[in-house]
């Protein structure tokens, strides 16, 4: 039986427990033995990490020690898959630049509503936007058959590099209150090879409502299976 390690924690606003619980039954149905950990400390357990086929991480704005990151990266290089969504994977460990290099993208911001529409809640950052499939995405097993779709949620502005295989993008518009003066396109779904391991990232998934969106849920399910050893 294959093994999946779910590592969750960090900022509660991303509902790490509720969102990961959505996918645990799916993973079990697909033949995985599931272990759940509430911190990245398990990454430093070399003997255990060597047995893991897939890591699903939802751990936002946390920190990782040198030993923990080394264990995580060594496992991925050896063939363990690594996947997740939103800040749980793309805004996990700002203290470790090597993690950002391995992942291929880092959340920078999520430009929100017009200032006069903001009320001091998370919804200030929920804006309507489109997830646009790339030519690669139209034919990739993770996103094949899924058309461009609309969401009203946080729209991630991502710092990234050209080593990613980008399956979908989203474009930040230019609005009167924003400081930039041309549109910015960021990857919203990408994959990346690191050693023998495969990495899957989708930046949608701010909360339970968004991971339950049929398109987002399907992409996450396919992405996790794709990344697995």
PLM features: residue spans?
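Extracellular ligand-binding/catalytic regions of CAZymes and related secreted enzymes
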Residues: 2, 29, 47, 175-188, ...
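Hydrophobic/aromatic beta-strand patches that form the interior of the parallel beta-sheet core
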Residues: 5, 83, 167, 200-202
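Short, solvent-exposed loop/turn segments at secondary-structure junctions
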Residues: 11-12, 62, 89-91, 148, ...
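Conserved beta-strand segments of alpha/beta enzyme cores
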Residues: 33-35, 165, 198
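Catalytic beta-strand/loop cores that center a nucleophilic Ser/Cys/Thr
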Residues: 28, 50-51, 119-195
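A glycine-rich, often tryptophan-bearing local segment used as a flexible ligand/cofactor-contacting loop or short
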Residues: 63-141
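Helical hinge/lid and interdomain linker segments adjacent to catalytic or ligand-binding clefts
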Residues: 5-6, 12-92
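Oxidoreductase and adenylate-handling cofactor-binding alpha/beta cores
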Residues: 99-106, 148-165, 220-229
């Amino acid at each position: 039986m294959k093994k999946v390690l779910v590592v969750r924690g960090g900022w509660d606003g991303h509902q790490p427990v509720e969102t990961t619980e959505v996918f645990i039954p799916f993973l079990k149905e697909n033949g995985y033995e599931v272990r759940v950990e509430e911190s990245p400390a398990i990454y430093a357990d070399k003997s255990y990490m060597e047995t893991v086929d897939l890591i699903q991480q939802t751990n936002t704005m946390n920190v990782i020690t040198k030993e923990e990151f080394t264990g995580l990266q060594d496992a991925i290089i050896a063939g363990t898959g690594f996947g997740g969504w939103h800040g749980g994977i793309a805004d996990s460990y700002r203290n470790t630049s090597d993690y950002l290099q391995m992942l291929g993208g880092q959340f920078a911001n999520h430009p929100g509503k017009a200032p006069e529409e903001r009320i001091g809640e998370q919804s200030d950052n929920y804006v309507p936007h489109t997830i646009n499939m790339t030519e690669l995405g139209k034919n990739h097993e993770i996103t094949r058959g899924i058309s461009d779709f609309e969401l009203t949620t946080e729209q991630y502005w991502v710092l990234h590099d050209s080593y990613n295989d980008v399956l979908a993008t989203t474009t930040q518009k230019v609005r009167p209150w924003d400081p930039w003066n041309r549109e910015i396109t960021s990857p919203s779904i990408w994959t990346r090879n690191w050693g023998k391991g495969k990495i899957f990232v989708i930046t949608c998934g701010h909360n339970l409502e968004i991971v339950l969106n049929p398109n987002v849920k399907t992409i996450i399910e396919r992405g996790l299976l794709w990344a697995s050893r």
